[in-house]
C-alpha cells in the first residue's frame, strides 16, 4: 500500500507543479526520471456527485472540481478549496477484505506498511465517518515541509483514499479539515446502472 500512497502524493505534487491553468488539458508525472502524460477529463460544469470505484461522494459548493485522471491504474479526482488541495483515489486491494475485517495485529502491520514510504505517518486513529470505518492518518514530508491529512478505508476489496494538504509550510486549518471530513462523510455506494 505504501506504493499507492506514494504514487498518489507524487502525482498530486506533480499535478500542482504543472501550473493548474484552466486551459491545460494534460498533466506530466515525473517518476524516477520516467515522464508519463496523463489525460485529465474536465467537464463543462462542476458535478454535484463524483463517482470513484464503486462509491460516490457529494461535492460541497465552496470547492472547485479540477478534473479526474487515471494514474497507474488508480482512479483519481482533484479538488480545490482556495489554497487547500484534495486528491481522492480508488485502488484495488490485493486481498478481498474490508478494514473492519482486520484484527488488531493485522491492522498494526497494515499501518506499518503505509509508513514505509518517504511520507512518514505522524499520527493515526480509527474513525467511523458516516457508514464506513476509516484510518485518519497524518503524514509529514520534511523535504516539502508539508503536512497531509488522509482518510483511508477498504471496502469490498477496494481502497479509498482522501488526501488533503496545502503546499509549503502553511498549516492545514480547522475549516480545511472540516472540508475533508464533509467529503468523506457523504461517501456512499453508487447506484448500480441498469443493464438495458
Language-model features, listed with the residues they occupy:
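Positively charged n-region of N-terminal signal peptides that target proteins for export
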Residues: 1-5, 9
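C-terminal motif of bacterial Sec signal peptides marking the signal peptidase cleavage site
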Residues: 16-19
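Short, hydrophobic/aromatic-rich segments at coil-to-beta transitions
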Residues: 43-49, 73, 128-138
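Secretory pathway targeting signatures of secreted, lumenal, and periplasmic proteins
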Residues: 53-104
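Surface-exposed amphipathic alpha-helical segments
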Residues: 63, 161-196
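Signature of long, low-cysteine stretches enriched in small and polar/charged residues
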Residues: 108-156
